[in-house]
């Protein structure tokens, strides 16, 4: 029972770190990266669909992204979705592909993005702490119901704290890495 609680908590924490990693990939760094388009969505035959699923995205140069839709009738929708997204990019449509030049980030914009990255990191840490709290509540319930002894539950709580600290440090590493990427000129 205790092992199940710990395993469940660890799986949820792993998922939270994966979500945070995906969130960080969407923050623009001034370098071309196909991951920055993961959250850009178009209306594809009535269904909201990420453009990464309706087009091939290539990075021929460090500051250029080329998007080639699988269906040419989606060109305008993809172009509009990129233009209207919060990425601050201006795509150009040449009739068969969309080119997106990635402009150099200003110092002020870099600072904003660092702040945004730290906020996402903090949100991920809150998620990890909530997972730990729920697991601790479950462990206390097990102890209260007499399904496990106090020593076993105490050891499990220490293991849970160690696991939480490990995942929090992974989030800190992700934030530090993203901050370094953003501030690199």
Swiss-Prot record:
Key words of the record: Cytoplasm, Protein biosynthesis
Organism superkingdom: Bacteria
GO annotation (BP), single: translational termination
Transmembrane domains' residue ranges: none
Major localisation: cytoplasm
Matching Pfam families: RRF (PF01765)
GO molecular function, a single term: ribosomal large subunit binding
HAMAP family: RRF
PANTHER family per record: MITOCHONDRIAL RIBOSOME RECYCLING FACTOR PSEUDO 1, RIBOSOME RECYCLING FACTOR
Name the UniProt record assigns to this protein: Ribosome-recycling factor
Name of encoding gene: frr
């Amino acid at each position: 029972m205790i092992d199940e609680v710990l395993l469940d908590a660890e799986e949820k924490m792993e998922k939270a770190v994966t979500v945070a990693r995906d969130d960080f990939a969407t923050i623009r760094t001034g370098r071309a990266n196909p991951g920055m388009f993961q959250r850009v969505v178009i209306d594809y035959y009535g269904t909201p669909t990420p453009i990464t699923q309706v087009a091939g995205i290539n990075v021929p140069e460090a500051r250029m992204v080329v998007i080639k839709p699988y269906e040419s009738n989606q060109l305008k929708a993809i172009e509009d979705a990129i233009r209207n997204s919060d990425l601050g990019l201006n795509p150009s449509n040449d009739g068969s592909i969309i080119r997106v030049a990635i402009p150099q980030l200003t110092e002020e914009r870099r600072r904003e993005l660092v702040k945004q990255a730290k906020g996402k990191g903090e949100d991920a840490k809150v998620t990890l702490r909530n997972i730990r709290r729920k697991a601790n509540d479950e462990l206390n319930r097990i102890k209260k119901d007499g399904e496990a002894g106090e020593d076993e539950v105490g050891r499990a709580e220490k293991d849970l704290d160690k696991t939480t600290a490990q995942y929090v440090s992974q989030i800190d590493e992700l934030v530090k890495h993203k901050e370094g990427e953003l501030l690199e000129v």
